[in-house]
Amino acid sequence: MAETSSLISGVAQRYAGSLFELALDAKSVAAVEKDLDRFEALLSGSEDLKRLISSPVFSSEDQLHAIGALADKAGIKGLVGNFLRVVARNRRLFALPGIIAAFRKIAAEHRGEVSADVISAHELSAAQQNELKATLKGVAGKDVTINVTVDPSILGGLIVKMGSRQIDTSLRTKLSSLKLALKEVG
């Protein structure tokens, strides 16, 4: 499992780096980010699309035609539209979520921002996200972009990963620590 994750991460980094260089040359990093956001919204809203990009059952041609038609219908043209077609042709659609995340991190670093991955037990409101960004900015000394993921299994609290640092205030971790402490006592 770790090897598969590492493979996807490596593929995602290479493709994201290439896309970023092309976007930088074309002076269209912001436009590319918007198109990737639009595609990610389509992806998160469609189980069929998730199946298309992750299943090896579909042929390269089927994936290419489906992604091309979807990109055209969603108005994703130019650099991102062509990029999605190349990724489909090369049978790397499975790495798209990682590519999008890696592109965001590269773009944020280029703008002088720090990226933080936040795992929450429930959806964070805009006010909570803004407060978290301000707090993390005080720690990092730079603007912080947050990528929020909802994971109900942490029960409560947050897990924040920023660079090489991780802050885990989840209720699950606190309960695990308490359980260990009680085992040592008893």
From Swiss-Prot:
Disulfide bonds: none annotated. It is a peripheral membrane protein. GO terms for cellular component: plasma membrane; proton-transporting ATP synthase complex. It holds the Pfam family OSCP. Its main location: membrane. It is found in: Cell inner membrane. F(1)F(0) ATP synthase produces ATP from ADP in the presence of a proton or sodium gradient. F-type ATPases consist of two structural domains, F(1) containing the extramembraneous catalytic core and F(0) containing the membrane proton channel, linked together by a central stalk and a peripheral stalk. During catalysis, ATP synthesis in the catalytic domain of F(1) is coupled via a rotary mechanism of the central stalk subunits to proton translocation. Belongs to the ATPase delta chain family. This is ATP synthase subunit delta. It comes from Brucella anthropi (strain ATCC 49188 / DSM 6882 / CCUG 24695 / JCM 21032 / LMG 3331 / NBRC 15819 / NCTC 12168 / Alc 37) (Ochrobactrum anthropi). The gene is atpH.
